[in-house]
Amino acid sequence: MHYDTITLTLKDDIAVITLNRPHVMNALNTQMRAEITQAVTQSGKDARVVVLTGEGKAFCSGQDLGDRQSVANLDLERTLRDEYEPMLNAIINCPVPTITALNGPAAGAGANLALAADVVIGAKSSYLMQAFSKIGLI
């Protein structure tokens, strides 16, 4: 399977899913959420463990707010229900252990993505930030 926003490697029964939009600190867009969901679901069948990490200096900066067209047309309820919930549930319900290798900041939805795994291992440069907790988005 070919992915545009992530990479998936499988070696020695270890699936490594790498968020691969480093130019936007691996910000989540609709395509990336769908690809993560699909890759985790498939890896749960093919691997004995799934590792999530990010390319570049960040794990994930959260929702891609730089794509003005997508943000202008964003239906938050639909996006949470139809995109974020399936992505997070794929990780939470994965039949094999899931590990987040936190290589830098994980903010907002990126922090939630990181914390959905069974185990989170962070580099010294990593941190989690809940950017929208004051409006109930955690």
Give the residues covered by each predicted segment:
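Glycine- (often His-adjacent) and acidic-residue-rich active-site loop
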Residues: D46, G54-A90, A106, K134
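Hydrophobic/aromatic residues within transmembrane alpha-helices
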Residues: I17, L52, D64, L113-L115
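Hydrophobic alpha-helical membrane-association signature
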Residues: M32-I36, E83, L113
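CoA-thioester-processing core
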Residues: M87, I91-N93, A101, A107-I138
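Conserved CoA-thioester-binding segment of acyl-CoA-metabolizing enzymes
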Residues: M1-E55, N89
